[in-house]
Amino acid sequence: MQQVYRGAFHCYIKFPHLLYQTGLSGHQNAKILIQLDTEPQNFDYTPENHLLNKFDVFGNIRTTPLDLLLAQKITAFIKRKQPKGRDIYDITFLCPKTRPNYVYLSQRLGVSNPDELKSILFDRLNSLNLNQLANDVSPFLFNPNDIQRIHLFPQFVEQTAF
């Protein structure tokens, strides 16, 4: 594992030979690399404790509150130079669970209410090719029908009470 900090925190975790040892690759030198990139958000919040009981892991983990996570995903969708279908997927996944943190959205996007949020989302949508974004995210979807989250995002924004 290698950790680097230059304005953002980068962590690279390599699993050499794992693909070969598990029979997933015939090449001994094949490796899996997991790259984690984070950057300071300069936004104070209280992490939530969540009991994790999956994947043979049982214990408490600290998590970002869902309202803040949704606001961060919306901000990423609006500000990314290269849009990602995964941002749309995440927004449609999180919205039924919470409302966005408007303090964060106000600081990052100058958005302080649902009408302003819808307006900025539609402005961004006008410049995007949803078919391209759907193709971008489709290899990562467990359920192929979830591609509709991308295709129907304009209707989702219209109907959602942010």
Label every model-predicted segment:
Residues 1-162:
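Structured mid-to-C-terminal alpha-helical surface segments
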